[in-house]
A protein has these predicted regions:
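Intrinsically disordered, low-complexity polar regions and short flexible loop motifs
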Residues: 1-89
Length: 89
């Protein structure tokens, strides 16, 4: 069983890292194509923060709160409501 567990952990880590890389790349592309109206420094810091999650998650012995995406999904719902109410104008 330990060999199987190690193999599955490695597969999960690879998939997680691919997702993190994808996310950071999407942010960088959005900025480079003018879709993000923030300073280069801010986008640099956030992109670096996203990529550093790979190391942080690799060093955790237990799941980190927030991996489920619930916080981000809840934020999207709240932002969508604000947009509908005209908060982005």
């Amino acid at each position: 069983m330990p060999v199987t567990d190690a193999f599955l952990a490695e597969i999960r880590a690879e998939a997680r890292n691919e997702g993190i890389n994808y996310t950071a790349s999407r942010l960088a592309a959005a900025f480079n194509h003018g879709f993000i109206n923030k300073s280069l420094r801010e986008v640099f810091d956030v992109t670096r923060m996203i990529l550093s999650a790979k190391e942080e998650l690799a060093n955790e012995s237990h799941p980190i709160d927030g991996l489920s995406g619930e916080y981000a999904e809840k934020s999207l719902e709240e932002w969508a409501e604000q947009i509908r109410k005209g908060a982005d104008k």
